[in-house]
């Protein structure tokens, strides 16, 4: 779809499969672009001098992306790039808005707007195996403005994806000693 000499990466499909958001350095910094899934000229959505990475579509017309813009002292938790915030921007462009000061990675959004994601409590090499510590990632559900922790294993739980009925989700976990795929119902303490 892209033939530019720039570095294009991190493609994310829109829910209706008509658009793809991606990261590109074709204008200098790593910005968010959107392109029709059938091809064509991409539209630049962000113009910050920092790096932005698309993580999901909030709906067919808005892209969620991570960036360390640190908007105000009141809304920032940590003062470096380790814990980026989540922003939302229209696929038509315009001014981005702060979506979350929490670092939300691997976001999966249900049709009703509920969000599954894994957290980031501290720095840990994402490729490290058998990591068990207080900063290991956990799966969370954001629903109606409330947050509910979905996993409690002391090791890595990450990359949640809704099932087709959106009553449960798949995720990666090392609870049996190596990364495997598990299925869990929402707000349940047991896997399948």
Identify the residue ranges that each predicted region occupies.
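A structural motif corresponding to the C-terminal end of an alpha-helix
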Residues: 142-144
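A flexible loop/linker signature enriched in serine peptidases of the S9 family
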Residues: 2-8, 23-33, 46-53, 61-87, ...
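Short coil/turn segments that connect the beta-strands within blades of beta-propeller domains
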Residues: 16-18, 60-62, 112-114, 165-167
């Amino acid at each position: 779809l892209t033939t530019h000499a720039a570095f294009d990466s991190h493609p994310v499909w829109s829910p209706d499969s008509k658009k793809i958001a991606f990261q590109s350095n074709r204008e200098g910094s790593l910005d968010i672009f959107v392109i029709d899934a059938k091809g064509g000229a991409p539209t630049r959505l962000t113009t910050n001098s920092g790096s932005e990475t698309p993580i999901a579509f909030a709906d067919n017309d808005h892209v969620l992306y991570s960036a360390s813009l640190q908007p105000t002292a009141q809304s920032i938790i940590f003062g470096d790039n380790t814990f980026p915030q989540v922003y939302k921007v229209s696929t038509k462009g315009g001014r981005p808005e702060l979506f979350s000061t929490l670092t939300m990675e691997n976001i999966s959004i249900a049709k009703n707007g509920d969000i599954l994601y894994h957290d980031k409590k501290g720095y840990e090499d994402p490729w490290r195996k058998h990591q068990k510590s207080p900063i290991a990632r956990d799966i969370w559900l954001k629903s109606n403005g409330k947050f509910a922790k979905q996993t409690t294993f002391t090791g890595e739980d990450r990359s949640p994806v809704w099932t087709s009925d959106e009553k449960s989700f798949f995720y990666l976990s090392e609870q049996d000693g190596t990364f495997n795929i598990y299925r869990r119902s929402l707000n349940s303490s047991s896997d399948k």
